[in-house]
């Protein structure tokens, strides 16, 4: 099972539905849920930190990003919280918009396996990661944001600024499937 921490974003139920379509059980929990409350259940194989409107109300996300031993994917605000937890800098976007954008993948990696080097995604850019922590590498960027996706260099810890769970994002299902594979789920190819 994948646990989705609800940071109040409009797409949190869409994340759960996208995982269901992949055959992956998922449960939405409040963002006040602690890492200990999550990992006490051995069926939990991964955590997704959802998007949301307010970085100050994402209570346990940074602790989860720092201390989880199971894979974590941050989406939009969740991506920003992961970066912030490790000392990255998050601030207002230069181009504040909610729109379809082109994403450029730097090179194939475990999160973007099977995804072309350029694709269209639906993204929200009010705030964004401006400076990436040293222990992370940038996986993807766009013309309006230099940090569209990150990965911790040693842990299964990922972030994406865009929304892979919405149908407007090309290959979003592939990205979510790749994350689920990191969590130990298997799929018929």
Curated annotation (Swiss-Prot):
GO terms for molecular function: ATP binding; GMP synthase activity. PROSITE patterns: GATASE_TYPE_1. Pfam families: GATase. Keywords: ATP-binding, Glutamine amidotransferase, GMP biosynthesis, Ligase, Nucleotide-binding, Purine biosynthesis. Gene3D superfamilies: 3.40.50.880. The keyword Membrane does not apply. The keyword Zinc-finger does not apply. It catalyses: XMP + L-glutamine + ATP + H2O = GMP + L-glutamate + AMP + diphosphate + 2 H(+). Its EC number is 6.3.5.2. One of its GO terms (cellular component) is cytosol. The active site is at residues 76, 163, 165. Residues 1-189 form the Glutamine amidotransferase type-1 domain. InterPro entries: Class_I_gatase-like, GATASE, GMP_synth_GATase, GMP_synthase_A. Pathway: Purine metabolism; GMP biosynthesis; GMP from XMP (L-Gln route): step 1/1. It comes from the Archaea. Catalyzes the synthesis of GMP from XMP. Heterodimer composed of a glutamine amidotransferase subunit (A) and a GMP-binding subunit (B). This is GMP synthase [glutamine-hydrolyzing] subunit A. It comes from Methanococcus maripaludis (strain C7 / ATCC BAA-1331). The lineage of its organism: Archaea, Methanobacteriati, Methanobacteriota, Methanomada group, Methanococci.
